[in-house]
Amino acid sequence: MTDQAFVTLTTNDAYAKGALVLGSSLKQHRTTRRLVVLATPQVSDSMRKVLETVFDEVIMVDVLDSGDSAHLTLMKRPELGVTLTKLHCWSLTQYSKCVFMDADTLVLANIDDLFDREELSAAPDPGWPDCFNSGVFVYQPSVETYNQLLHLASEQGSFDGGDQGILNTFFSSWATTDIRKHLPFIYNLSSISIYSYLPAFKVFGASAKVVHFLGRVKPWNYTYDPKTKSVKSEAHDPNMTHPEFLILWWNIFTTNVLPLLQQFGLVKDTCSYVNVLSDLVYTLAFSCGFCRKEDVSGAISHLSLGEIPAMAQPFVSSEERKERWEQGQADYMGADSFDNIKRKLDTYLQ
């Protein structure tokens, strides 16, 4: 159907790889809808050309040059830059209905039935179920709605600093008005919830249609071994409870996306990695007396797409942490997050 579309957003080349895997997974499961990606100026020209091979439309979005109220809103609230770009999806009035999907989602089955739903249909957020998660939602493009969202963003901002806060404020009746607009969790299965409610995942996980890689570590931040089809992370990722979803992401990437990136010169041919090693590298590698050629070759044949975003972790003593708690300054987004506290309790209860 040409008047309905799946829409995603990429703000840089790293997220573009996620968008490419998402688009490939939608095609793999034979969607009949058009595929649209919104891209910001930070996406390179070469990557845009790759996106054009997977998506039916690549729409450049630059809020600063938009010439509409989005520009004025950005001037007033510069912290909402990416959020305003995502809200731009409501301006795609060439489509009668769309499903927005974040670039860190992966489709596991055909989900064209989502277009039978009405605006705004979304799944509950695992952190606060009375709010919906904005990683997957059904909406109806409208200039009027778009302008109303921009006005809300300008006047009130976002309670969580992102699009999810604005959208939950705008569609505030979602929690109580119409249960038909509550998508089953299988349409937005968050990687975090797999850990927090493992028994439910064991029962219902096989029915999942969309997995959402929430959190700081994204699939493209892992290192993938094509020979063993395994993934690993340089940083400890407590949410990697079920790596089969990550492996599935990488399988689609290596099969469908990697050849395109190589074709457009964005990734060197992985088969030639060993051959281009200089004599100096080999000399240094073998000088320790313990390294074997096959070990070095294997190590550099692994695929790694990007660094994990740096996250400052200053040392805080137990006494300092206790004082902060007593002063109401707990680090709810970091060391004192619910997941970290739960893991600590689990170790004592085992």
From Swiss-Prot:
Swiss-Prot/TrEMBL cofactor(s): Mn(2+)
Cofactor note: Divalent metal ions. Required for self-glucosylation. Manganese is the most effective.
Positions bound to Mn(2+): D102, D104, H212
Known EC number: 2.4.1.186
Subcellular location: Cytoplasm; Nucleus
Name of the top EC class for this enzyme: transferase
A Pfam family the protein falls into: Glyco_transf_8
Gene Ontology process terms (BP): glycogen biosynthetic process
Pathway: Glycan biosynthesis; glycogen biosynthesis
Catalytic activity: L-tyrosyl-[glycogenin] + UDP-alpha-D-glucose = alpha-D-glucosyl-L-tyrosyl-[glycogenin] + UDP + H(+); [1,4-alpha-D-glucosyl](n)-L-tyrosyl-[glycogenin] + UDP-alpha-D-glucose = [1,4-alpha-D-glucosyl](n+1)-L-tyrosyl-[glycogenin] + UDP + H(+)
Activity modulation: Inhibited by palladium ions.
Database matches in SUPFAM superfamilies: Nucleotide-diphospho-sugar transferases
Example of a GO cellular component annotation carried by this entry: cytoplasm
Annotated positions binding UDP: L9, T11, N12, Y15, R77, D102, A103, D104, H212, G215, K218
Sorted UniProt keywords: Acetylation, Cytoplasm, Disease variant, Glycogen biosynthesis, Glycogen storage disease, Glycoprotein, Manganese, Metal-binding, Nucleus, Phosphoprotein, Transferase
Annotated positions binding UDP-alpha-D-glucose: 9, 11-12, 15, 77, 86, 102-104, 133-134, 160, 163-164, 215, 218
PTM annotation, UniProt: Self-glycosylated by the transfer of glucose residues from UDP-glucose to itself, forming an alpha-1,4-glycan of around 10 residues attached to Tyr-195. Phosphorylated.
Annotated site location: Important for catalytic activity: K86
Region annotation (Interaction with GYS1) ranges: 301-333
Tissue and organ distribution: Highly expressed in skeletal muscle and heart, with lower levels in brain, lung, kidney and pancreas.
Chief subcellular location: cytoplasm
PTM annotation (Phosphoserine): residues: S44
Protein family according to the UniProt entry: Belongs to the glycosyltransferase 8 family. Glycogenin subfamily.
Subunit and partners: Part of the GYS1-GYG1 complex, a heterooctamer composed of a tetramer of GYS1 and 2 dimers of GYG1, where each GYS1 protomer binds to one GYG1 subunit (via GYG1 C-terminus); the GYS1 tetramer may dissociate from GYG1 dimers to continue glycogen polymerization on its own. May also form a heterooctamer complex with GYS2 (via GYG1 C-terminus).
The protein's name: Glycogenin-1
Organism: Homo sapiens
Upper lineage: Eukaryota, Metazoa, Chordata, Craniata, Vertebrata
